[in-house]
Every structure is written in structure tokens, then in C-alpha cells.
């Protein structure tokens, strides 16, 4: 799979793009390409449009509720029973967006997910499971790390609750810090998968920086692209060894959490989610986790290949 960009769905041109007027999350360089792609696009466009209309209907009904939930119940939406049809409709809309697989559909799904977490701090629907991989697919690695760290902190016994969504607790956290926090009392297997992907992309970028001359276009992360001089001054060898240690710990943690995780991750045909209910450590848990995180891995195949080789050699 190609890394996501704002580009024509058909020819990948990035100039003078038009949006699909129905789903709003597919772009084309011309009306001709839009017409040419319609037979395929309508398979995904129509469900998105349908779920958007249903969401609009539920939002209109909820905004008319006498308890004024959008003003008075923010942060407690899932506990407020009348808001549940709206939250479920929003979740269905996000699911429909996931089938479109464009930059705009992922960005839209992320925006809706973050707003759902603002409305419902308890996250009774498990929206937080998918957010880091959405950040990663958009090239927003720092925000992915801040999100993972915030929820890892929240899940600790002394994590606390300041009334703000956990993903807002940290900003520009150090991606080179120890990973133990993210492994203790962890809440979702796929967050650990997403953190592993982030660390491997980071490692590959650091290794690329060692090459002379290096190709700026080969860098996978903005974390490295925006800090080249700083990272070189810090000493690349030490950073590389540190990140390798983090990767080793994460791989060990993932295997201990679920022994099926590598079988599913390295065999895409086996990663289809079969159920929303599963027991910890089961094959179904691994399938659900990989189903959520795999698009981000598929758009970073160098990282997937590196992890597979690392796991097989260790």
C-alpha cells in the first residue's frame, strides 16, 4: 500500500484536486477521472453518505433534547443514555470511513474519534483503540506517541483523572524515553503494536541518517526529518542502540500479552477481525488488534519486514 497523501484516487496527481461531492473524502484531478473511478468508488461512497445522513439525524435529535447534552453533559456522553444512539451513529460513520482508505477519510475518522473522546472521557465504546494508528497513517508520529503515553498513564493505578481526555495530558513527550510506562497496566494490544511501529520507523530513519550522503526523501518520520541536526549532535550510535532496546522490550511484551500476535501480523490473510468479543491472549484478540493497526503497517512495509526479520532471528 502507498503512504497516504492528498492525491487523485486514480492517478495520484496532487495538483488542482476536486472532492467527491457526496462522501467528501475522495479527491480527483479531473471530472473525467472521477467518472472513470465511480464504479469502484460508489462501493465505499454510498455507505459513507448513508452513515453521514444517519449521524446528522441523530445529532439533530440530540441537540433538541431538553437536557442540552452538548452544553451540559460534555465528558459524560456515554453515561447519558439519550446520547448513545448519537455515539453509535458516529461510530458507524467512522467505520464506513475506514473502508475508503484515503488521506481525507483517515483525517476525518481521526477528527471524529478525538471529538468522541472529548464528549465521553470514559470511552465506553473503545474509540481510543484505533487513534494512534490513524495518527501514524497521517505522518503525525509525535501526536501518536503523546496519545499512547497519555492513555498508558491513565491506566496506571495512580494515573489520576484531571477531567481532561488522557491524550491531552502530554505534548511533545520524549519519544526516546523508556517504554516501560507503555507496557505496564496496558489497556490495548494494538496500542503496543502502534508503539512498536513508531519505534521501528524511528530506528530506520536513524540508520538512514548514518549514511553519507543520505536521502532526505527516504526518511519515514517527521520526528527525525525535523530534528536532523539535533539528533546527530546527540550521537546517533547511542540513540540507535536505545531504540533497538525499546523494540526488543516491546516485542517481548507483545509476545507475552498474546502468543498469536506475530502469526497474525505477518499473515495478512489471517488478520480479519472475527468478533468484537474475545478473551485476553486469544487468537481473536490478536486478530482484532491487527485488524485495527494493520493499515498503518501496510503503509510502512519496510518496518513490517524489519520486525518480521527481527522476530524470526530472536
Regions found by a protein language model. Give the residues of each.
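Acidic, polar low-complexity intrinsically disordered regions
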Residues: 64-68, 84-86, 103, 119-120, ...
